[in-house]
Curated annotation (Swiss-Prot):
Gene3D superfamilies documented for this protein: Pheromone/general odorant binding protein domain
Protein name, entry field: Pheromone-binding protein 2
GO function term, MF aspect, one: pheromone binding
Signal peptide boundaries: 1-22
Entry annotated with the keyword Signal: yes
InterPro entries cross-referenced by the UniProt entry: Odorant/phero-bd_Lep (IPR006072), PBP/GOBP (IPR006170), PBP_GOBP_sf (IPR036728)
Family classification: Belongs to the PBP/GOBP family.
S-S bridge residues: C41-C76, C72-C130, C119-C139
A Pfam family reported for this protein in Swiss-Prot or TrEMBL: PBP_GOBP
Described purpose of this protein according to its UniProt entry: This major soluble protein in olfactory sensilla of male moths might serve to solubilize the extremely hydrophobic pheromone molecules and to transport pheromone through the aqueous lymph to receptors located on olfactory cilia.
Originating species: Antheraea pernyi (Chinese oak silk moth)
């Protein structure tokens, strides 16, 4: 279950990679593709629009998610993308494959999975998987900021709207 949360964090945020200036571009691609199932998750979980705003604001350096439904949305997206196994654990191969399919090289994909595992281990215990996912996501965001891999969400939204 905890690994599922990490995977969800990876996906929720998982949109990036290529150890250098290309990393924000890779993260943008990861984010765009991670979010493609959002309409389905929004409907299944009856998510309010405020959750979408939470996820949009997620990458802002000083933004802190507080709505547990955002964690639920990340869990839903990760499940839809088969980044977690049937037991809810992070599926390393699928997570790495997802990252590489959307622009990450082997090193970046491996580092993303490692970051999620580190965040999973350092996050406080919580029986509420949605809250646990939010904790892991916030840790993941912090680590991505340290690497300067943060995607430009205005570009992500612009490209998503262009596809619609």
């Amino acid at each position: 279950m905890i690994r599922k949360v990490l995977l969800s964090v990876l996906l929720a945020v998982l949109m990036t990679i290529n150890l250098g200036q290309a990393s924000p571009e890779v993260m943008k691609n990861l984010c765009m593709n991670y979010g493609k199932a959002m309409d389905q998750c929004k409907q299944e979980l009856n998510l309010p629009d405020s959750v979408i705003a939470d996820l949009y604001n997620f990458w802002k350096d000083d933004y802190v998610m507080t709505d547990r439904l955002a964690g639920c949305a990340i869990n839903c997206l990760s499940t839809k993308l088969d980044i977690v196994d049937p037991d809810g654990n992070l599926h390393h191969g699928n997570a790495k494959e997802f990252a590489m399919k959307h622009g990450a090289d082997d090193g970046m994909a491996h580092e993303l999975v490692d970051i999620i595992h580190g965040c999973e281990k350092s996050s406080p215990p919580n029986d509420d998987k949605c809250i646990k996912t939010m904790d892991i996501a916030m840790c993941f965001k912090k680590e991505i900021h340290k690497l300067n891999w943060v995607p430009n969400m205005d570009l992500v939204v612009g490209e998503v709207l262009a596809e619609v």
